[in-house]
From Swiss-Prot:
Lineage: Eukaryota, Metazoa, Chordata, Craniata, Vertebrata
Function: The isoform alpha-1A gives rise to P and/or Q-type calcium currents. P/Q-type calcium channels belong to the 'high-voltage activated' (HVA) group.
Protein name in UniProt: Voltage-dependent P/Q-type calcium channel subunit alpha-1A
Naturally occurring in which organism (per UniProt): Gallus gallus (Chicken)
Subunit-structure text: Voltage-dependent calcium channels are multisubunit complexes, consisting of alpha-1, alpha-2, beta and delta subunits in a 1:1:1:1 ratio. The channel activity is directed by the pore-forming and voltage-sensitive alpha-1 subunit. In many cases, this subunit is sufficient to generate voltage-sensitive calcium channel activity. The auxiliary subunits beta and alpha-2/delta linked by a disulfide bridge regulate the channel activity.
Membrane topology value: Multi-pass membrane protein
Keyword annotations: Calcium, Calcium channel, Calcium transport, Cell membrane, Disulfide bond, Ion channel, Ion transport, Membrane, Repeat, Transmembrane, Transmembrane helix, Transport, Voltage-gated channel
Localisation: Cell membrane
Catalytic activity: Ca(2+)(in) = Ca(2+)(out)
Positions of the record's site feature: Calcium ion selectivity and permeability: 117
Amino acid sequence: FVTVLGSITDILVTEFGNNFINLSFLRLFRAARLIKLLRQGYTIRILLWTFVQSFKALPYVCLLIAMLFFIYAIIGMQVFGNIGIEEEDDESAITQHNNFRTFFQALMLLFRSATGEAWHEIMLSCLSGKPCDENSGIKEDECGNEFAYFYFVSFIFLCSFLMLNLFVAVI
């Protein structure tokens, strides 16, 4: 009864515009109607309880995803971290902000790849035949690696198919 009375008062104050006092707290009664509805519906309560219980396993799935990103970022830094960045080359997906030089940049590149944004272009930019960075101290001419095929395809497979399905299955 109090919920309905508070909601009606809020609607009347809003409609007639007598805002001489700030009565915005009355909008809480609208939310109270939803809580009252949830108490009455048995099936809605069961559904919400199941949803809340699924949050217990969610941190473990998030930890597994974080471990996958961590491992792939470290491997990417070791294998592809010395690829040179060419300012004038528009075809290369390895840029100043999109590379494996630091751990944070590697994580950002992997997150970008996990979302599906041009991961194949990044993979092709990490293949052999790419020049090394002058500041890396490496005397070799090429810093790319054919390992990029396995690296990116396995990462996309694990992220897109296994982890995403595991995340959705928990929820």
